[in-house]
Amino acid sequence: MTCAQWLWKKIIALYEQAAECDGEVVRPKEPNWTAWANEIRLMCVQDGRTHKQICEMYSRVSRDPFWCRNVLSPSKLREKWDELSLRLSPSVSTYTEKREDPYFKASYDNVDYSQIPAGFRG
């Protein structure tokens, strides 16, 4: 139940943050604690995740502008877990942003053209 309560506190914090910008946002109703605790239990027992992994994943979700609006319950977190692990993984986003193609050269100043056969020289 502690993990479910922690998730609820994070969700309430998101609503409070949204209410600062938009006065129409109201606090959501209390969740069905039994259903929430059961989803957390299923993530642990069936999916093999720990409470720490669940909390770390939701921390990443709550920092993402898109996913924080779409994952507002343990059931949605469980449903989207695989997609979220790829999209929000620090190593994947860092890799895709900073990877360098070994065949792409921004400058051809350092290319040795002496090895090009005579018929191919321009």
Swiss-Prot record:
Q: Name one GO biological process term.
A: response to oxidative stress
Knockout phenotype, as recorded, reads:
Deletion of this gene, or the entire CPS-53 prophage, reduces viability under oxidative stress.
Q: Which domain of life is it from?
A: Bacteria
Q: What else is known?
A: Encoded by the CPS-53 [KpLE1] prophage. Missing about 200 N-terminal amino acids compared to orthologs.
Provide the family line: Belongs to the phage O protein family.
Tell me what this protein is called. Answer: Protein YfdO
Q: Which organism is it from?
A: Escherichia coli (strain K12)
Q: Which gene encodes it?
A: yfdO
